């Protein structure tokens, strides 16, 4: 316990508040302290006790829970009886000499006589306090145990008159100070994160996939989430806990009390009431929300009214107002706005909250006379229960309740501020699901209208060409799928073999360097400042010598975190903060200490006068000013050197470049280098030598690249580009410009990159024509020179270095970083070299590729590269147009790279950590098969559907697609545009045999519709969407890795479902395509 630090300032302040109220009571609604002689509390050992007044008082005063501890507050002294270790901590409370502060006496437990001697001392102290009769206790607190029982017997024998002080102490602790408010804010932030990032998304996923999940399972998941860093806002998980078990209720059975328990019934997709609260440093918070799935207009109206009631209460929470008045005024508001709801309201609208989750004596109810004070924190909750929904189709949806709650802080001005500002309007909690049956009715009408327009205009023979083309595409798709199945079988086996060969390799733990300024006192400087006990900065040894208790103590500059200087009146202050365990560290600062158990200095502040006395050369503060300047200089120099050392520590030592004296060495002049060696861009020359390249800038800077360190070399011509370049992707980083680099590029510009818009131009201007001709000649000249250089290097190195040229015709747009660029495949890589930073993926290093967000209604998708080295971070390319999906698949398939696809974004960091933690277990559970489509017979179904040519209507599919992309067009204009596109010419008319056969098939199909009430939707365009369009998120085995999207789209689309065995299909918008539409809208 000696390592724990007491907040002495808070301890003094709070003890003085307790004694001030005791000596001169000011709380009008409770006078329990008025005639009290002494106060006693005991905290025993009981794991089942989560909240108690004794524990709350102890935490409020000391900041820590001390079990088996008796606290006695007498008129002029405070006594603590506890074990020896805890006494070491409590020694920090002694030697406080403030006026009006009681004396602190510490008693160590004596097990030889079972503390009878200590009990006698305490009872004597109680009897000597004032009259020694009336003892203030917490009547409802009951701790079992031998120690507690023995103390109770001693008290009973002494015949004190017990007075319950629970209410008055609770009211005393109710106004929070700044540190307490900060703790509650952090707890509220965690509550919101768990609710928004976990619970909300989990409920959405359950509804999306139509799964059956029990309420208690969801509750357990919330409790587990508080241990995960992504939900805890960077707070220490050891200081976090749930204030109560999360409550999830649905299906008609609702209890709007925080004593309710999540039952084992499955989640019902109707009204879902959720409540949860986190604790940080024992300070509680709460958030309650209600989700409405397909709510009726009446339900939406009731919910909107409930939100307005809560907003009205917030306006009434003003300091000086009685809580019963707040309740009555709220009741009057409800009677005025919606009198039918008065009987459905709860008995109270909230309660005070802090170290205890619920303070029963301070509630917003009809009988509470307590006055509101600034900085009180309340769990403000309002609800309406026992409501009926006559439009519900099932028994569970007939009865429902609405409930919302927040953690609020009473301020100086109205209204009170909400500390859990999670959105709660109907558009944020309403979930609107559109069934396929409703959608198909609309689609049937649309299809009939399009067919009618087609018959009037007639059909061209282009339809037969499209059908023939489609058959060929289906055959190609089947071959590709078959090849991918073969690759999938090989993937897991090769991965297991590779991991078995690699074995276990552990990273070396980095420890902060233990720097020693002087090995002996003889090395200490003998400067006058040192002798005069002034601050002295030793630049040579990078040490600051500071006077501490009259002794000069050296501190190496690496121990100093930061310094600050301020002038206040006649004094200058210099504050020096040190690194210590528990302090926040920078990204590049080592956080591990050689001796973490040692005693560390946190900060030191020096004060010196600015007043110059007679006879003095300068003011005393000149020493602090000079020290401040020198420390900054030495610190800057030290950090710069450390940064350079960090850059160098992972470097692999390279061989020495062997210069070739041959004058015929391949050489290119007037090249720029990326990244720049210095800030200013300079040209230079690149020359090939015996074992590597050397680049020399005009300033004389040298960069050497050895052949054996080149992983990939690229030559990109200037066709369609403004630069021509050579790019080297290295195996190991090299150092230049004081930084490490794995990608080095040499390039020159072709033509003018910028255009003078103010220049007068003419189509046939001779100067412009001459400039264009000159540019064409320059391009040809540069292309020839670079190509010749590459060929000479390949010949000289005997193909050790081979230059790849990107295939521009195979390129596709994507955003590997912030901006969209053109990604171009090479024979062994996927690259973008024009923009900086470059993007280079070596295909030999790729394990598999996964496509994310492959859905009908989205215009683009993401591509994830998983590397064979599983410890390496996955590479991501965002925003690839959906019409390039088949193109990318075909390229990957030709490179023998396994790919998979899904409708959602996955948490790849979590996936890769799971794999690296237990690779054997991962492959035993199927390995990468979790990314496969959910249906094994999907290919067979697709083939069967593709053979039913008479049921395929390309015009319908295309028009559906067009309507998704350009929804602002009218239906009539869509029909006309599509008809023009399909017919090819307005003059073509008449019907051929294929049209007549199609009409006959349509009549047969219509007959089937009448006989069977399950119409088959038109097929999608397989060329545009490929097999991805058949994937449904409902049964994906990768749900456990899904990352939770933060936003949900609120619009609906008319996309058709291609699945026959599902009554309802729900698709979920990705947060990156909020502008597009989906089958389900969420508000």
Curated annotation (Swiss-Prot):
Entries under InterPro entries matching the protein: Creatin/AminoP/Spt16_N (IPR029149), Creatinase/aminopeptidase-like (IPR036005), FACT-SPT16_Nlobe (IPR029148), Fact-SPT16_PH (IPR056595), FACT_SPT16_C (IPR048969), FACT_SPT16_M (IPR013953), Pept_M24 (IPR000994), PH-like_dom_sf (IPR011993)
Biological process, per Gene Ontology: DNA repair; DNA replication; positive regulation of transcription elongation by RNA polymerase II; regulation of chromatin organization; transcription elongation by RNA polymerase II
Biased composition range(s): Basic residues: 1024-1033
GO cellular component, as recorded: cytosol; FACT complex; nucleolus; nucleus; polytene chromosome puff
Coiled-coil parts of chain: 466-504
GO molecular function: chromatin binding; nucleosome binding; protein heterodimerization activity
Subcellular location: Nucleus; Chromosome
A Pfam family matched in the record: PH_SPT16
Transmembrane segments: none
Record carries keyword Ribosomal protein: no
Acidic residues bias (residue ranges): 935-987
Job description of the protein: Component of the FACT complex, a general chromatin factor that acts to reorganize nucleosomes. The FACT complex is involved in multiple processes that require DNA as a template such as mRNA elongation, DNA replication and DNA repair. During transcription elongation the FACT complex acts as a histone chaperone that both destabilizes and restores nucleosomal structure.
Quaternary organization: Component of the FACT complex, a stable heterodimer of dre4/spt16 and Ssrp. Interacts with TRL/GAGA.
Name of the protein in its database record: FACT complex subunit spt16
Gene name, Swiss-Prot/TrEMBL: dre4
């Amino acid at each position: 316990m000696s390592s724990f630090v007491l907040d002495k300032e808070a301890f003094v302040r709070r003890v003085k508040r307790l004694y001030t109220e005791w000596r001169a009571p000011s709380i009008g609604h409770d006078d329990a302290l008025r005639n009290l002689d002494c106060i006693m509390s005991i905290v025993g050992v009981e794991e089942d006790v989560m909240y108690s007044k004794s524990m709350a008082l102890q935490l409020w005063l000391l900041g820590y829970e001390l079990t088996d501890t008796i606290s006695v507050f007498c008129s002029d002294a405070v006594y603590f009886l506890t074990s020896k270790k805890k006494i070491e901590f409590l020694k920090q409370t002694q030697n406080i000499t403030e006026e009006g502060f009681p004396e602190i006496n510490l008693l160590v437990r004596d097990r030889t006589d079972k503390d009878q001697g200590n009990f006698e001392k305490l009872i004597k102290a109680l009897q000597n306090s004032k009259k020694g009769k009336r003892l203030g206790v917490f009547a409802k607190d009951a701790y079992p145990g031998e120690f507690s029982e023995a103390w109770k017997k001693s008290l009973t024998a002494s015949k004190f008159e017990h007075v319950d002080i629970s209410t008055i102490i609770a009211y005393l602790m109710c106004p929070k100070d700044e540190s307490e408010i900060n703790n509650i804010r952090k707890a509220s932030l965690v509550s919101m994160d768990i609710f928004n990032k976990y619970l909300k998304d989990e409920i959405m996923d359950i509804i999306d996939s139509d799964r059956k999940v029990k309420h208690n399972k969801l509750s357990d998941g919330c409790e587990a989430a508080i241990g995960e860093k992504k939900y805890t806002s960077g707070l220490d998980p050891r200081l976090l806990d749930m204030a109560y078990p999360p409550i999830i209720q649905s299906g008609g059975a609702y209890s709007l009390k925080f004593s309710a328990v999540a039952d084992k019934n499955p989640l019902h997709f109707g009204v879902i009431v959720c409540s949860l609260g986190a604790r940080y440093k024992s300070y509680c918070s709460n958030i309650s929300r209600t989700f409405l799935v397909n709510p009726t207009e009446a339900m939406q109206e009731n919910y909107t009214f409930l939100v307005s009631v809560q907003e009205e209460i917030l306006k009434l929470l003003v300091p000086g107002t009685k809580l019963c008045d707040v309740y009555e005024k709220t009741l009057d508001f409800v009677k005025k706005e919606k009198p039918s709801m008065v009987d459905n309201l709860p008995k109270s609208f909230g309660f005070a909250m802090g170290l205890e989750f619920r303070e029963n004596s301070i509630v917003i109810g009809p009988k509470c006379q307590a006055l509101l004070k600034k900085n009180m924190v309340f769990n403000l909750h309002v609800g309406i229960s026992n409501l009926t929904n006559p439009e519900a189709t099932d028994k569970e949806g007939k009865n429902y309740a609405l409930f919302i709650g927040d953690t609020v802080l009473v301020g100086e001005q109205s209204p009170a501020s909400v500390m859990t500002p999670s959105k709660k309007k109907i558009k944020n909690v309403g979930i609107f699901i559109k069934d396929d049956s409703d959608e198909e009715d609309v689609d049937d009408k649309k299809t009939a209208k399009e067919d009618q327009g087609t018959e009037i205009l007639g059909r061209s023979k282009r339809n037969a060409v499209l059908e023939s083309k489609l058959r060929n595409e289906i055959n190609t798709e089947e071959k590709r799928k078959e090849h991918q199945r073969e690759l999938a079988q090989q993937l897991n086996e090769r991965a297991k073999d590779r991991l078995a060969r690699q074995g276990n390799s552990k990273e070396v733990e980095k420890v902060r360097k233990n720097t020693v300024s002087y090995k002996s006192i003889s090395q200490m400087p003998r400067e006058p400042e040192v002798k005069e006990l002034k601050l002295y900065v030793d630049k040579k040894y990078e040490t600051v010598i500071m006077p501490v208790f009259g002794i000069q103590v050296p501190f190496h500059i690496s121990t100093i975190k930061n310094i600050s200087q301020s002038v206040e009146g006649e004094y200058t202050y210099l504050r020096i903060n040190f690194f210590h365990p528990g302090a926040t560290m920078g990204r590049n600062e080592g956080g591990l200490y050689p001796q973490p158990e040692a005693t560390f200095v946190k900060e030191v502040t020096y004060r010196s006068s600015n007043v110059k006395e007679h006879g003095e050369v300068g003011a005393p503060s000149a020493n602090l000013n000079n020290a401040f300047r020198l420390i900054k200089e030495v610190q800057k120099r030290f950090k710069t050197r450390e940064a350079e050392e960090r850059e160098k520590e992972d470097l692999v030592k390279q061989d020495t470049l062997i210069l070739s004296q041959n004058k015929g060495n391949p050489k290119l002049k007037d090249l720029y280098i990326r990244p720049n060696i210095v800030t200013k861009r300079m040209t230079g020359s690149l020359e090939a030598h015996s074992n590597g390249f050397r680049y020399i800038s005009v300033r004389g800077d040298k960069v050497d690249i050895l052949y054996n360190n080149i992983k990939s070399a690229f030559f990109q011509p200037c066709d369609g580009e403004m630069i021509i370049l050579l790019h080297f992707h290295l195996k190991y980083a090299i150092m230049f410009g004081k930084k490490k680099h794995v990608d080095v590029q040499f390039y020159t510009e072709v033509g003018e990159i910028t255009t003078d818009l103010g220049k007068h131009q003419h189509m046939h201007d001779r100067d412009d024509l001459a400039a264009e001709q000159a540019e064409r000649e320059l391009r040809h000249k540069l292309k020839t020179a670079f190509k010749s250089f590459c060929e000479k290097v390949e010949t000289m190195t005997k193909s050790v270095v081979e230059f790849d040229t990107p295939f521009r015709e195979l390129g596709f747009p994507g955003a590997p970083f912030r901006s969209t660029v053109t990604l171009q495949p090479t024979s062994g890589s996927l690259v973008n070299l024009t923009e900086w930073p470059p993007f280079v993926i070596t295909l030999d290093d790729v394990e598999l590729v996964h496509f994310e967000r492959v859905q009908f209604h989205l215009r683009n998708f993401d591509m994830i590269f998983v590397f064979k080295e599983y410890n390496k971070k996955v590479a991501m390319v965002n925003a690839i147009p959906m019409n390039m999906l088949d193109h990318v698949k075909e390229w990957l398939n030709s490179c023998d790279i396994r790919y998979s696809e899904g409708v959602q974004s996955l948490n790849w960091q979590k996936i890769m950590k799971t794999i690296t933690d237990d690779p054997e277990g991962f492959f035993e559970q199927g390995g990468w098969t979790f990314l496969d489509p959910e249906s094994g017979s999907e290919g067979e179904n697709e083939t069967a559907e593709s053979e039913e040519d008479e049921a395929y209507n390309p015009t319908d599919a295309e028009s559906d697609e067009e309507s998704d992309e350009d929804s602002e067009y009218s239906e009539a204009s869509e029909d006309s545009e599509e008809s023009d596109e399909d017919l090819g010419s307005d003059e073509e008319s008449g019907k051929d045999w294929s049209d007549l056969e199609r009409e006959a098939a349509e009549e047969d199909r219509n007959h089937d519709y009448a006989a069977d009430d399950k119409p088959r939707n038109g097929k999608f365009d397989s060329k545009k969407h490929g097999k991805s369009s058949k994937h449904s998120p409902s049964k994906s085995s990768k749900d456990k890795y899904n990352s939770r999207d933060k936003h949900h789209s609120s619009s609906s689309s008319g996309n058709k479902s291609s699945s026959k065995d599902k009554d309802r299909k729900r698709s979920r918008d990705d947060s990156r395509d909020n502008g597009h539409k989906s089958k389900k809208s969420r508000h």
